[in-house]
Every structure is written in C-alpha cells, then in structure tokens.
C-alpha cells in the first residue's frame, strides 16, 4: 500500500468517527426525545382508556339490573374485561418500550460520546506516532546516503543503509496495517450502534406483535357471541317471559297489557318513568284475589281489567252512547294521528286487579260516556295550567282549556290528548283535568283501580277524603269548593270515598249509572302527608 493510499484511508477512518459523534449521536438523541413523546401519548391513551372502560362497566351494571337486558349487561361486562386485558397488554408493551428501548439508548448515547472521543484520540495519537517513526527513519536514511556520496569509501555505509531501508519498510507496513485496522474498527463501531438500535426496535416490535395477537385472539373468541346477543332487539329474554307468565298465573295478578293498547296493536309508551301505583286500600283487600277472568270489565275512566289486552273500550261503549252519536274512530286512524309523538317505550310492571265482585256490584262509570263527543272521544276541562317545557311529547294548556282525549285510557296518571284551543297534541297529567258531562259541565275525575293511579301513597281512607300536596308545581291555586273543599296547592291525584259507602249509595240509587256521582267530600285541613284533620 502506497503512502498516499494510507493517508486516504486515515482520512476515511477519521470521517467515520466524526460521523458517529456529529451525526449519529445527535440523531439518536432526537429519536429518544420523540420516543418519550410517543410514550407520553400512549400513557395518556392508557389513562383515558381506564375511564372509558369504567364507564362501560357502569353501563353494564345498569343493564344487569333490568329484567329485559340482563344478558346484555353480562355482554358489556365481558367487553370491559376483554378490553381491560388488551389494555394490560398495551401497558406491558409500553413498559418494554420504555425499559428496552428508550432507557438503554439514552444510557448508550451518553457513554458513547465520551468513548468515541477517547477512541478517536487514541487512534490519531498512535497513527501519528507510527508516522513520526517512519518519517524519522526516512530522514536518517537520507542523511546516511548524503554522507555516503561525499565519502572516499562508500562501501563503509552500505550495510547501515540496508538496515535503515529494512526499518523504513517495517515501519511503513506497521503504519499501513494500523490505519487499515483503525478503519475497520471505525466501521465496526458504526455498525454496532445501528445494530443495537435495530435490535431494540425488534424487541419493541415483538411486544407490539404480542399485543395485537392477544387482542385479536380475545376479540375473535368473544365477538360472535356479542353480536348474537344484540341481533334481535325486540326479543324478550326467556327469564323475563317466565316471570311475566308466573305473575299472570299467580293469584290476584293481571296479564300485562303494555304491549298492546287495542286490537290494532297500538303501542303506547309510558310518558313518565318511575310513577308508582297506589297500594291496595284496606276496603278492597278482602276482594283482591277473587278475580274472574271471564267477567273482568273496565271499572271507571276507561281502565281495562285483567284480560283486556285485546279489549277495545271505545267499541264496548256503543250501547251506552245516545243514538245520535256516531261510531267511534278506528284505532288505526288514531295510530296515524299521534304515533309519532309518543315517548320512548318502557316496560310496564304488571299490577293487581280487583275481583269481579266490584264489577258485578258497581257498573261502569258513566263519566267517560258522558264526556264523549259526537266523534266518539271524551272531552276534559283543565282545572290547572300545565307547562310542557322543553319536552316535545308533553302538552301545554291553560286553566279552563278543553282537551279531547285521543287514547282510551290513562297511563300511570298521564293521558294523551289534543287541546281544542291550540290544536297541539301530547301527554298531560290527568289529575289536572275534569271529565265533562254531556251537558258541558265538569265533574271530578275519580278512579277505583289501584294499578292506574299516579299517586305515590295510599290516599284512600275509610271515612275521610284528603288531597295530598302537589309533587311538583310552583304556583298555588284554590281547589273548587263544591267538590273537595278549599285547598292552596295542586293535587297530584284524586282519591275516592270509602268503598263501603259506595256500595250503600249504589244500593240506594240503583237507577244511577255512577254510584259516586252525588258523593259530597268533607272539607279538611292538612299541612303534611299524615292523616287529615277534620274541620
């Protein structure tokens, strides 16, 4: 190898070391900084995922409390658990990314800057030393030859000249070998650093592959079952169906009629969730359980009995209407008129019905028949104002407004009708209105059936009648004195007098269609929900 070739290789060696120190290490530091940002972002995703799946578990708890969606709650729990395992795998990948890549690279780059500086300095010092030794031998040989040329006996310097030539040849070989080895060492150092980076990145990729493989395995195993669970939203679980069947077959209970309001299968949703029925009053307790499914008929206000799932109360009242009244409107037309305004459907809990003794003793109330117009619908008069607010399914009206009912019976104290003044339709509290007689006068709305009342307590008393304070409402009004005395607040529901009193009145006035038409209420004063004080 010539001297010029050795010098060129020496420059290449120095360039390799300088490239590592001036380009590779700064780029590696930038890579580590970007990796830390990536790690921070993944940590944020992990934290957000925990909150997300905690919320999913909460939704599963809500579903598990429902009789109709219990298995969907189990599915949500499984989803949360599967994704929790996937998230744990992601956290393991994040730990490996931090420990096996970022930490080790950061340690290497700090040590490497000092190591490379020392290695380059050592190489340059050794190369300079060998080069200086070679230059010294060459200078000595040059002096010797100059002496030999001026001497009278040149043969005297020939042996020594040969020794210098051999020494120069050896030192030049050593320098060339050292430069060659130095270049090889520099390339090896550079390659080792890139190999270390690739090796650590492979470890991260391996953990990432394990993460995705684990997620795929868990999801592929569970996903078909989850999709099957939600394939039919209209299917009622067997457990809920058996429960309804047991309640239907048990003594003193009725078949749930929430799925059908008429022969046209008109579905009417519950407008207000959480409304609870009144307990069975003591006067009616002896009659509960003696139900005859063949003779169950509506008692009052169009409320159907136990076997009335396909019963049409409007059609059944044809005999009670005057001959001048036209046939009632078909349920299919009613469905078209207000089906789009009904609230979201909720399942209705089956409620107890009363025995047929009441049905045989007490005929159906004529209050609803009296309130029917010529179009076959019942009319009521508002005794309090009602504001719907932002709820588009509710009906707003003022005191004194007339409302035409569009459905045959109330739902948990709420009725659906159309205001004759504003022509708007919606749900409204039935206790805010009175049924109109055929002559246009209004009468107090009363209901004997416990299952259709919206009151929150047992307001029936053997001897007294009291109206509770309103459950909601800010303004106070005086209740009409001709019916229930003077009150300062709105009633939420209206109770009826003693059942035994109704039997006596009916026995004395068998010609009347309504045994409670002439019942006079005793004025009372009460400040809370306890028993009223007679004035």
Curated annotation (Swiss-Prot):
Low complexity bias spans: 321-335
| Chain positions covered by the region annotation Disordered | 308-370, 445-486
Q: What is the effect of changing residue 178 to F?
A: Loss of phosphorylation
Q: Any idea where this protein resides?
A: Cytoplasm; Membrane; Cell projection, Filopodium; Cell projection, Ruffle
**Residue spans of biased composition, Polar residues class:** 349-368, 447-458, 473-486
What are the recorded Gene Ontology BP terms?
A: actin crosslink formation; actin filament bundle assembly; cellular response to epidermal growth factor stimulus; cellular response to L-glutamate; dendrite development; modulation of chemical synaptic transmission; neuron differentiation; plasma membrane organization
An example Gene Ontology cellular component term from the record? presynaptic cytosol
Q: Name one GO molecular function term.
A: transcription coregulator binding
Tissue specificity remark: Ubiquitous.
State the disulfide connectivity: none
Q: What is known of its domains?
A: The IMD domain forms a coiled coil. The isolated domain can induce actin bundling and filopodia formation. In the absence of G-proteins intramolecular interaction between the IMD and the SH3 domain gives rise to an auto-inhibited state of the protein. Interaction of the IMD with RAC1 or CDC42 leads to activation. The SH3 domain interacts with ATN1, ADGRB1, WASF1, WASF2, SHANK1, DIAPH1 and ENAH.
- Which named protein is this? BAR/IMD domain-containing adapter protein 2
Query: What is this organism's lineage?
Result: Eukaryota, Metazoa, Chordata, Craniata, Vertebrata
């Amino acid at each position: 190898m010539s001297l010029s070739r050795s010098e060129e290789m020496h420059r290449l060696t120095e360039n390799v070391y300088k490239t590592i120190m001036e380009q590779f290490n700064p780029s590696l530091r930038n890579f580590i900084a970007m990796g830390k940002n990536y790690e921070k972002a993944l940590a944020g995703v992990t934290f957000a995922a925990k909150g997300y799946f905690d919320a999913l578990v909460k939704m599963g708890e809500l579903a598990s409390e429902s009789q109709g969606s219990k298995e969907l709650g189990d599915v949500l729990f499984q989803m949360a658990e599967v994704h929790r395992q996937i998230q744990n795998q992601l956290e393991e990948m994040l730990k490996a990314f931090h420990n096996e890549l970022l930490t080790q690279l950061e340690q290497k780059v700090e040590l490497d800057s000092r190591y490379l500086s020392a290695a380059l300095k050592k190489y340059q010092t050794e190369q300079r030393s060998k080069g200086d030794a070679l230059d010294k031998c060459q200078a000595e040989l040059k002096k010797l030859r100059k002496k030999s040329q001026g001497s009278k006996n040149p043969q005297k310097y020939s042996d020594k000249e040969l020794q210098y030539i051999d020494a120069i040849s050896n030192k030049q070989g050593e320098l060339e070998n050292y430069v060659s080895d130095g270049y090889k060492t520099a390339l090896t150092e550079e390659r080792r650093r890139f190999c270390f980076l690739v090796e650590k990145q492979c470890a991260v990729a391996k953990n990432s592959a394990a993460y995705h493989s684990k997620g795929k395995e868990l999801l592929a195993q569970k996903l078909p079952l989850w999709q099957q669970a939600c394939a039919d939203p209209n299917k009622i679980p067997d457990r809920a169906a058996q429960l309804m069947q047991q309640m239907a077959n048990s003594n003193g209970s009725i078949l749930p009629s929430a799925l059908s309001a008429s022969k046209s299968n008109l579905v009417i949703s519950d407008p207000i969730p959480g409304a609870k029925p009144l307990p069975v009053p003591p006067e009616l307790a002896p009659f509960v359980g003696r139900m005859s499914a063949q003779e169950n008929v509506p008692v009052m206000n169009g409320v159907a009995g136990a076997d009335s799932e396909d019963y049409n109360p409007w059609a059944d009242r044809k005999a009670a209407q005057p001959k001048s009244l036209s046939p009632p409107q078909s349920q299919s037309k009613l469905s078209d008129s207000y089906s789009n305004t009904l609230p979201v459907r909720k399942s209705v809990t089956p409620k107890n019905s009363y025995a047929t003794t009441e049905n045989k003793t007490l005929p159906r109330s004529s209050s609803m028949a009296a309130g029917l117009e010529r179009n076959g619908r019942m009319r009521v008069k508002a005794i309090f104002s009602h504001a719907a607010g932002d709820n588009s399914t509710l009906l707003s009206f003022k005191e004194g407004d007339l409302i035409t009912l569009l459905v045959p019976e109330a739902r948990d104290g709420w009725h659906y009708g159309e205001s004759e003044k504003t022509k708007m339709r919606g749900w409204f509290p039935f206790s805010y209105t009175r049924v109109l007689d055929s002559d246009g006068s209004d009468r107090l709305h009363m209901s004997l059936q416990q299952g259709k009342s919206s009151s929150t307590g047992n307001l029936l008393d053997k001897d007294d009648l009291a109206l509770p304070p309103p459950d909601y409402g800010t303004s106070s009004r005086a209740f009409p004195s001709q019916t229930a005395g003077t009150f300062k607040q709105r009633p939420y529901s209206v109770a009826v007098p003693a059942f035994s009193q109704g039997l006596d009145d009916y026995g004395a006035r068998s010609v009347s269609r309504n045994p409670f038409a002439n019942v006079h209420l005793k004025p009372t004063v009460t400040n809370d929900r306890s028993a009223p004080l007679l004035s």
